[in-house]
Structures are given as C-alpha cells and as structure tokens.
C-alpha cells in the first residue's frame, strides 16, 4: 500500500498571493493532485522569474537586473534589486513553480517536488539541490562620476574604480566626501565563505562569477596581495580600516569568468552584473562593509569567523582565479559548447547558438538535475510532448526525470550548471 502524504501549509497554495493553503490535508500518493505534482519532475520546470532579495538584505543593488533581464518579461520593481535567485532549493529564497490542476493554478515550492519525487528531480548523484544560481547587480557609479566631473582633475576621474576610491579617500571637501560615501555604498562587502570543516554548523560555499555586464573601470577584489600577512590584515580589520588596499583589484569585462574557492577573501565592486553559481549555502562572513549604514545602522561584521575561514598561505597570484573557456564541442549545425568551470562543487558550461551552430542536445538522466539561464536571445526547448519558447532573463530547471531534450536558437547564449 502506498504511503500517505501529508501536505502542510508550508507547501501548496492555490492563491497567487499565498493566502489560501492546503492545511494538514491528508492525500494519498495515488490521488490526482499527487500524480500531477510528481509528473512535474518529468518536464522542464519554470521558476517564478522575480525571486528577488529585498533591498534591506542587498542594499548595494542596482537597476540592471530589472532593466536588462526582467522588464521584457513583464516584471517591474520600484526597488533596487541586488540578487535574483534563479535556480534555488535554498529555504531562504526557494524556487516556486506553477502547476495547473483542476481549473486552478497551484504555486508549488521546490520542497514539495523534493519530498514527492527526489530521484526524478535530482537524479542518481545527489539527494538534495546540489547548487544555487544567482544573478547579481551592484549599483552604478556613472551618476557619481558625472557629479565629480567639474570637481576633480580629469586624470583622476579616468582611473578605475579602486584607484578612484583611493584618490578620493584623502579629499576633505565635504561635497566630494558625501559623493564618495554614496559611491562606496554600491560595493559589496569584503567577505569570505567558510571551507569544509571550518565550522560544524556552517556549510562551505565555493562559487564562480561570469561577468555579464561591466561599466568601464569596474572590477572585483580577489585574494590578498603579495606580501600582506595575516597579522597585518587582522590589525586593520579589527581597527575597522579600509581593507581593499590589502586585496588584489581586477578590472573585468563582459565574458570574464572567475572561480572563487571557499576561504578566498573577495568583494564585488560597483557597476557589475554577473551570474554566480555556487554551492547551496548562504554562509557569508563580512570583514569590512565600507562604512555602510543600512536601515539606520551598520551591518554586522564577522571578524573571528573571517580569521578562521580565510586561506592565509599559498598562491597569491590573480591568474589562479581566472578561468579560460575550453571548447568541448563545435560542429556544423550544432551549438558551440564551452566548459567555463569544472570543479568538484559544480560544472559551468556556456552554450552559444548562432545561425551556423543552432541546436544543442542534452540528457538530464546522464547529468542529474541541470540549471539553464538564458543571458542572450530567445531559445526553443523541445522534449517529449513538450515545446516552448524562452526569452533572455528566464531560467529553467531541468529535472533528471526529463531525459533527452534539445534547444534551438540563432543568436542566443545560455549558461548551464550541473553537479
């Protein structure tokens, strides 16, 4: 006899606002609603496209996620958006899918599918969501550079973001200091994520960045500079001093790919939009937050945890972080497939479709669950008894139970994440 399933109110809503819930309703696995839910894991899963973090959580956010990736999908927001959790099984911002059932639309969190059909959802290689994929956008410096145009020397204004920050740090003009403070609030904090084994109750977090858009002069901070000691860093950190002169600053352009192992000090600078695949974890330790005041007070710092988690020894070169795409498949009529990152935590692949390379074939039985994020153009996705067009800014979760599928496009790019 099939085991009964109990759907608690944390699971299903048949109201778009989430106000009407199935409460403690005991439903047999053989019931039509359960069969409909399980059947979802044999088709592409389309997450709600507005899975955004609120400004209080990501106060450094900008407008690019809405303007460049979501507005044409009918999504608007009056708030800045720092993060869009595109492929997520994390309880903080889980993906929610729609299921048409008996004349209504159910809003189905990924946790329901994970409970009902974990093998069809994840595949044979894992029993929970193995990765998390976000689009991040840090606020722009363009308006501040315009404000500074007649206030500082042109050769200073032409500097990259980090060098401009350093140049402005010694300026005592009240107007310039106020502009500088606003500029710094567009950077993400200097932070680190723990390695496996650093803490019993805090999972590791290794991640990668694919730069989607970058303002001129924008960049990232990655790793300690040559010659900086653990003791020097700790003294400045505990004094609340600016830590960025101790880190490598790297100017970036669209298309660049970086791999950030857990334990690496880093920060995302202003003026960037990037895709971030990572381990399913949100453990972040802040070492420095630019003097930011958010919701009326400074955000919490994690100084002891930073000291425990950071890798202090080893290679300090920036070349270790940058990944060079490796073309693994290119033939007439087929897509251009490039491996961007292939590590034990996840694999990241870029699929390019153009008039002479217009079709990609995949098999989620072989790979397990996949995440697809469309960063350019439109695509058509085809599978057994399934065909649908997707647009730039949409993401697709490919469950293991789908199996064979194909993607067609002519001027399109998508990023694929697998375990």
State where each predicted segment sits:
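Short acidic-glycine-tyrosine-enriched beta hairpin
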Residues: 247-259, 383-402
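Short beta-strand segments in beta-sandwich/barrel cores
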Residues: 358-359, 377-382
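Loop-centered beta-sheet repeat module
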Residues: 237-286
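His/acidic/aromatic-lined binding-pocket segments of jelly-roll/cupin-type domains
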Residues: 179, 188, 200-202, 207-210, ...
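Ligand-binding loop in jelly-roll beta-barrel domains
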Residues: 174, 183-187, 195, 203-204, ...
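Short beta-strand/loop turn elements enriched in aromatics
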Residues: 211-235, 337-339, 353-368
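Transition-metal
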Residues: 2-229, 291-323, 348
């Amino acid at each position: 006899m099939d085991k009964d399933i109990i759907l608690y109110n944390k699971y299903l809503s048949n109201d778009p606002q989430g106000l009407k819930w199935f409460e403690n309703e005991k439903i047999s696995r053989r019931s039509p609603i359960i069969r409909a839910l399980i059947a979802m894991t044999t088709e592409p899963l389309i997450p709600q496209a507005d899975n955004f973090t609120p400004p209080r959580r990501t106060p450094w956010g900008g407008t690019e996620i809405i303007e460049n990736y979501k507005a044409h999908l009918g999504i608007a927001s009056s708030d800045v958006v720092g993060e869009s959790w595109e492929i997520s099984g994390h309880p903080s911002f889980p993906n929610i899918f729609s299921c048409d059932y008996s004349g209504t639309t159910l809003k189905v969190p990924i946790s329901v599918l994970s409970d009902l059909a974990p093998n069809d959802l994840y595949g044979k290689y894992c029993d929970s969501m193995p990765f998390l994929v976000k689009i991040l956008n840090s606020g722009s410096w363009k308006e501040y550079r315009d404000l500074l145009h007649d206030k500082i020397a042109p050769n200073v204004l032409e500097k990259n973001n980090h060098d401009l920050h350093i140049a402005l740090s010694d300026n005592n003009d009240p107007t310039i200091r106020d502009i500088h403070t606003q500029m710094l609030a567009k950077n993400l904090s200097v932070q680190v994520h723990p390695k496996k084994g650093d803490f019993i109750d805090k999972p590791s977090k290794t991640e990668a960045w694919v730069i989607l858009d970058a303002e001129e002069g924008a960049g990232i901070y990655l790793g300690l500079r040559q010659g900086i000691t653990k003791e020097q860093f700790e003294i400045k950190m505990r004094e609340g001093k600016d830590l960025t002169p101790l880190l490598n600053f790297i100017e970036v352009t669209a298309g660049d790919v970086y791999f950030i192992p857990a334990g690496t000090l880093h920060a995302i600078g202003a003026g960037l939009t990037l895709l971030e695949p990572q381990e399913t974890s949100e453990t972040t330790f802040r070492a420095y937050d630019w003097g930011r005041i958010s919701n009326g007070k400074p955000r919490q710092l994690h100084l002891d945890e930073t000291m425990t988690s950071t890798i202090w020894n080893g290679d300090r070169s920036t070349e270790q972080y940058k990944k060079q795409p490796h073309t693994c498949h290119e033939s007439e009529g087929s897509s251009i497939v490039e491996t961007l990152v292939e590590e034990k935590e996840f694999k990241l692949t870029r699929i390019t479709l153009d008039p002479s390379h217009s079709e990609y074939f995949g098999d989620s039985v072989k790979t397990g669950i996949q995440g697809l994020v469309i960063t350019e153009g439109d695509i058509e996705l085809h599978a057994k008894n399934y065909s649908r067009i997707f647009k730039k800014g949409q993401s697709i979760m490919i469950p293991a139970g789908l199996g064979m599928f194909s993607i067609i496009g002519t001027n399109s790019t998508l990023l694929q994440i697998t375990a």
